[in-house]
Amino acid sequence: MALRAEYENSADIGVFTKLTNKYCITAPGGSSSYKIIEQEVSPKIPCVEATIGGLRIIGRLAVGNRKGLLLPNTCNDQELLHLRNSLPDDVVVQRVEERMSALGNCIACNDYVALVHPEIDRETEEIIADVLGVEVFRHAVGGNPLVGTYSVITNKGAMLAPNTTQQEQEEIGTILQVPLVAGTVNRGSNLLGSGMIVNDWCGFVGMDTTATELSIVEGIYKLRNETDVQFASVMELMK
């Protein structure tokens, strides 16, 4: 199931949140429509409030999966310690000396593979492979190097910006080995990483997301429960 949410009247919930299969990090504050994220995920995984370098744009600055969390060098010692103490013990939390500090914009990953900005530092690439335990591939999405902004990847599926060419889709599909689709959120926005957060069992999209967009998100990431799938199958047969 995927739900709509917003952060202080912003539909760009992915800017302020980081969701993995092992933990969720949210920005301080937010209205009741943002707190729904914590309500949904906290029974299964820890949900932690945090800032990075005093900023609330967690999703843009950090990248992680069930094995680790990478933070930019703007993250101060107190924030680093807070996250290390709050996340599960087997999640490695590490600061990265990368000149492109918006790691969340430059990296898209699941628990096995990472797509990264083609110009990311070689040392950073090695840290990504080591801490997150993934294979790393330098790639663009729709000709844009900000792969974390223009794609969202889980272990079950991936969505790419709509201007992604067929060749790019085939290349990325071969790399990821999961079903993928080109799509939008928030009523036609191609800023997928900004507009949604997804793991293997739940997802959240910006409040402006249409019913059609929401349905595609639920389908590609396999977020529908069995009853929903059966109902959809019946409706398809009735057409």
From Swiss-Prot:
Transmembrane segments: none annotated. Pfam families: eIF-6. GO terms for biological process: cytosolic ribosome assembly; ribosomal large subunit biogenesis. Keywords: Cytoplasm, Initiation factor, Nucleus, Protein biosynthesis, Ribosome biogenesis. Monomer. Associates with the 60S ribosomal subunit. HAMAP family: eIF_6. This is Eukaryotic translation initiation factor 6. It comes from Entamoeba dispar (strain ATCC PRA-260 / SAW760).
